[in-house]
């Protein structure tokens, strides 16, 4: 993505996008694209507590990031971005979305959190790119050509 989304557009970013940005691995192209997306959309980004948890557990297990850095990262997420908590409304919405779209439990929570915060774009490598939800949220795969 070469231009930033307008600041009125809220963008929810799924876990794998964050992980590509944080971990330099064998797929440098995806890492670079993820970093660019996060930079370009920084003012419009929204995350959920689930995404923060998933990022942290993967950084601990796969990248062996020290706990002190994980603590700093958690604080940074909460300081820099709106964080959607997985409350009753989000969980009930996730259940409804699972029924409508045949999603996994965890993917439905991601989608419900994105809908709940009013995001218009959900960046995800895992969910169905192009899917429109309730007429205002579109799933985009930032790595698709």
For each predicted feature, which ranges?
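Acidic, PIN/NYN-like endoribonuclease modules and their adjacent C-terminal/linker elements
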Residues: 1-6, 111-145
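Short, well-structured N-terminal submotif of metal-dependent ribonuclease cores
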Residues: 1-47, 62-72
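Short acidic, glycine/proline-enriched helix-loop-strand junctions
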Residues: 73-76, 81-87, 91-92, 100, ...
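Active-site-proximal, substrate-binding regions of enzyme catalytic domains
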Residues: 54-82
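Substrate-recognition element of Asp-dependent hydrolases with the DxDx(T/V) motif
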Residues: 45-50, 124
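Active-site neighborhoods of divalent-metal-dependent phosphate/nucleic-acid chemistry enzymes
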Residues: 3, 82-122
């Amino acid at each position: 993505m070469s231009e930033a989304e307008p600041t009125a557009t809220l963008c929810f970013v799924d876990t794998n996008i964050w992980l590509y940005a944080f971990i330099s691995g064998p797929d440098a192209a995806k890492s670079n694209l993820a970093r660019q997306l996060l930079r370009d959309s920084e003012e419009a980004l929204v995350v959920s507590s689930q995404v923060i948890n998933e990022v942290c557990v993967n950084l601990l297990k796969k990248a062996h990031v020290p706990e002190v850095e994980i603590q700093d990262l958690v604080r940074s997420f909460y300081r820099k971005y709106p964080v959607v908590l997985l409350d009753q409304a989000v969980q009930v919405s996730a259940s409804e979305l699972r029924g409508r779209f045949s999603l996994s439990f965890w993917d439905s929570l991601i989608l419900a959190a994105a809908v709940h915060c009013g995001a218009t774009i959900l960046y995800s490598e895992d969910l169905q790119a192009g899917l429109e939800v309730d007429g205002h949220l579109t799933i985009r795969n930032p790595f698709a050509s």
